[in-house]
From Swiss-Prot:
Highest rank taxon of the organism: Eukaryota
PANTHER family tied to this protein: ENOLASE-PHOSPHATASE E1
Single GO MF descriptor: magnesium ion binding
Known catalytic reactions: 5-methylsulfanyl-2,3-dioxopentyl phosphate + H2O = 1,2-dihydroxy-5-(methylsulfanyl)pent-1-en-3-one + phosphate
Protein name: Enolase-phosphatase E1
HAMAP family: Salvage_MtnC_euk
Residue sites binding Mg(2+) per the record: 22, 24, 222
UniProt cross-references to InterPro entries, sorted A to Z: Enolase-ppase_E1, ENOPH1_eukaryotes, HAD-like_sf, HAD_sf
Pathway: Amino-acid biosynthesis; L-methionine biosynthesis via salvage pathway; L-methionine from S-methyl-5-thio-alpha-D-ribose 1-phosphate: step 3/6; Amino-acid biosynthesis; L-methionine biosynthesis via salvage pathway; L-methionine from S-methyl-5-thio-alpha-D-ribose 1-phosphate: step 4/6
Length: 301
């Protein structure tokens, strides 16, 4: 399908009862992650670890990070931290481990785009929770997102998120966004515990979990590899082109409809029959992603 390269052109898609949104580069600026979240973590991680270094939860988080990032090895943090310490002793031990931790942090930041199945800093997500709930950080949302969410849900459509970030991180971003709490618009969340975003089977599994055919879902992402995977699973797809996103070749621009914003999205009613199928499948499968709004998140911060 050929597409206009006119940056001002608005593409209108046929209505759909379900929409599946990527986050980074789609609903949210890529720069938000790299220019807001990562610098915040750099500034806060040492103080946070100094306060919580002797807790089993933080040691487990750092161990997960070490295993996820290539070249970091798998030696336990407990081996470096020694016995549990408190107060000044914990701070002293942290200072001794500072080069190790900062090296780990830098590797996490550098490899984030290359490790889509990891939740690197988000595993140490207590920092994010503090950032969002304190109001020091608010999730960036493009200005056309909220009107689109309102319009689509008013038409009866259901909206879902599928991101490399953990479900808990997704809920923090949309729950503490610049536009307020957007979670009421969302019917469910999926992360890479469902499967890799470049694997067609992941999208088939998502459609089955929602309880609709893949053809009933429009998937939106800035990554053409993800759009190809969703299309291979028979989902309708559109490439989202936002400022700062990776450039597309002329050939890539012909593969899928291109959206520069969400003004061309139209919803269709998610019927009672479909909703009933969804509830039945939830009950049968115990799907955690769809139940995320009512149950503890996959990665509880």
């Amino acid at each position: 399908m050929a597409n206009s390269t006119d940056e001002t052109a608005t593409t209108t898609l046929a209505p759909a009862p379900c929409f599946l949104f990527d986050i980074e580069g789609t609903t949210t600026s890529i720069s938000f992650v790299h220019e807001v979240l990562f610098p915040y973590a750099r500034n806060q991680v040492e103080a946070f670890l100094a306060a919580h270094w002797d807790t089993d939860a933080v040691k487990a988080d750092v161990d997960k990070l070490r295993e996820q990032v290539s070249g970091c090895g798998k030696r336990s943090v407990a081996d470096e931290a020694g016995p549990k310490e408190h107060g000044a002793e914990a701070a002293s031990r942290l200072c001794a481990s500072r080069p190790i931790l900062l090296n780990l942090l830098e590797k996490i930041i550098l490899t984030w785009p290359l490790v889509p199945t990891a939740h690197p800093l988000l595993e140490l997500g207590h920092i994010w929770k503090d950032a969002y709930t304190s109001g020091n950080v608010k999730g960036h949302i493009y200005e056309d997102v909220v009107p689109a969410f309102q319009r689509l849900t008013e038409a009866g459509a259901q909206l879902y998120i599928y991101s490399s970030g953990s479900i808990a991180a997704q809920k923090l971003l949309f729950g503490h966004s610049e536009a307020g709490d957007l979670q009421p618009y969302l019917s469910g969340y999926f992360d890479t515990t469902t499967g890799p975003k470049r694997d067609a089977a992941s999208y088939s599994d998502i459609a089955a979990a929602i309880g609709v055919t893949p053809q009933s879902i429009i998937f939106l992402s800035d990554r053409i590899e993800e759009c190809r995977a969703a299309s291979a699973a028979a989902m309708r797809t559109a490439l989202v082109v936002r400022p700062g996103n990776a450039p597309l070749s002329e050939a890539e621009r012909t593969e899928f409809p291109i959206l520069h914003d969400f003004t061309g999205l139209r919803g269709a009613k998610f019927t009672q029959a479909q909703a009933g199928d969804t509830e039945a499948k939830r009950s049968a499968s115990g799907d955690g992603a769809l139940a995320a709004k009512k149950a503890p998140p996959t990665h509880d911060f």
